[in-house]
Structures are given as structure tokens and as C-alpha cells.
């Protein structure tokens, strides 16, 4: 997969969102993901917010050794994403879960090197699952932190108060490194 294919998929995702007035925003700071995936040699990734599949495709393009589990509740987006991954030849790297994250997360048992939340502002109920699913020294990347709340709400404050994470903010994205279990 080359950069032109990823660019086309990104533009398609933007156009789809505009035409359908849906919440499937493509993540605009993918270079942040590349930085943390390559610097930590992340191989097992959990994504919340599949949309049309752009971000999973971007992450899969970094290395054929990367495997992504992705969750989205929109069945139409799931079909579009699956089709996009098949066209790009990365469908074997991505496992898709259709359903609300609140329903899917409790059933997940894998431990992830990196978790990428790209839905609306995250709820506190996700943090417990993230702590369980993220390995020690794993990276939790949360986009759209300020979508509903300029301060990032309770989730951001909980990360700041927690002694389990070292964190920082880049644009609207929070990066948190899990220091211990």
C-alpha cells in the first residue's frame, strides 16, 4: 500500500462524512500514530472508532506484522471499512468488532501494545477497560479530547490524577504511557 492509496482513503472518509453527516471523522494527525507505533514497535493495536477504515489502514501500512482489532457500532461503516481493507490487501491484519464499545470491550481478552480511541470524547467507563487491556509501558492515544469539553472532562482529569500513566497532549490528542499494572 502506498501513500497515494492512503491519501485517497482519507479523502474518501472526509467526503463520506460530509455526504452522510455521520460521525466517521478520519483522524487528521496520523503521523502521531506512526511515531508511537514505530518508536515502541507496537504490533497489537486496539482501535475504537473504525469509521470507513482509514486509520486502521494507515496503522496496518506501517508494518505487515501489525494486527489491529477495531470496534465500531455502525454496520454500514463496517461494510465500507472491510471493503477498503480488502482492496488494499490488509484485511488479514484487521479484525473488526461491530457493536457499541461498552458491549464489546468486556469480552476482549488480548493485551494490546497500543490503544487508539477515535470516537467522541471518551467516557470514564472506558478507562477501566483500557487499564485491563493495555500492557505495561503500552500507549493509550485518545483523540477528540476536547470535542465536548474544553478541558477533556472527567476522563482527562482521571488520567492526570492517576499515578499509572505519564501523559501529555498534542493538538486534541492525549498520549498516555501506562507505567505499571
Model-predicted segments: where are they?
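A short alpha-helical cap/connector motif
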Residues: 1-114, 121-141, 145-181
